[in-house]
Amino acid sequence: MKNKNIYPWVVVGLLWIVALLNYMDRQMLSTMQEAMKVDIVELNKAEAFGALMAIFLWIYGFMSPVAGIIADRVNRKWLVVGSLFVWSAVTFLMGYAQDFHELYWLRAIMGISEALYIPSALSLIADWHEGKSRSLAVGVHMTGLYVGQAIGGFGATAAAVFSWQSTFHWFGIVGIAYSLVLILFLKENPIHNIAVKEIDNTPKEKKPSVISGLSLLFTNWAFWIILIYFAAPSLPGWATKNWLPTLFADSLNIPMAEAGPISTITIAVSSFIGVILGGILSDRWVQKNIRGRIYTGAIGLGMTIPALLLLGFGHSFISVIGAGLLFGIGFGIFDANNMPILC
């Protein structure tokens, strides 16, 4: 199992499913407003539904750097397992929610637990894949996010056939069961265990404090430029991903059971295409110009601007779907170059 040539890809395969569950569980709520508002009347207000989506993102954003600090200091296998188990349990419990406040707090807990996953998973993959396979391994893992986003769109379809409560229950049970699979087969990289022990054995006066590290980070002007660079497209990006099912249903006059899968598959497939195109283009451009990745990312970001306008003003199937495809390709091109730019 732990063959040095095979097991690194077993890790990618195991975590690919976790990545799928990560985006599936967070995305499915955006398609289930229609089914849920019959029982939870507060969801008839767009402001209340928006608050559910926003609390997750706020907590996810604030927890991400904390998650990175934790991942550097503990066994990442158990962090991944614990993260998956908690957010899957939260998904299961959402099926028992009887009012808006219960949903709100469960969504907040999901933000904490899901934020712990990505830093741990990416660093775990990076440690198991040294050299030429690292970028490919990370890229394969990221495709799990797009597939999960697409599958999450079927939450509305499942809710229409069964019930929204049963949909949350079964999606949660799948994640809880898979966390048990990870306990058996996912392994921490031995190098990381050695590094953690060295940190633990380092005299306290020689250990860099978290506060000093954050102080150094926040006083670096380059950090703020990068922060704005990531934040600017995230505002329309997450608004689009969270509200696109509703927009499709309203603009095209189709039931949410159809609008959910159509919208999420449109974004997921086009984003995947954008990632591939953006990666190929930037890899070639950077060989001729050191700013090639930055320019490629800027092109992708620029494509999202007309797409957002078309999404807002379009009322025909072709215009709305076309705008969704354009947005996904542009965001995928932008997304493909984020991490390489940082590295």
Identify the residue ranges that each predicted region occupies:
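Helix-breaking motifs and short loop linkers at transmembrane-helix boundaries and internal kinks
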Residues: 75, 96-102, 130, 314-315
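Extracellular/periplasmic helix-loop-helix junction of adjacent transmembrane segments
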Residues: 32-62
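Cytoplasmic helix-loop-helix junction between adjacent transmembrane helices
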Residues: 106-144
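Juxtamembrane intracellular "pre-TM" segments in multi-pass secondary transporters
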Residues: 2-4, 192-225, 251
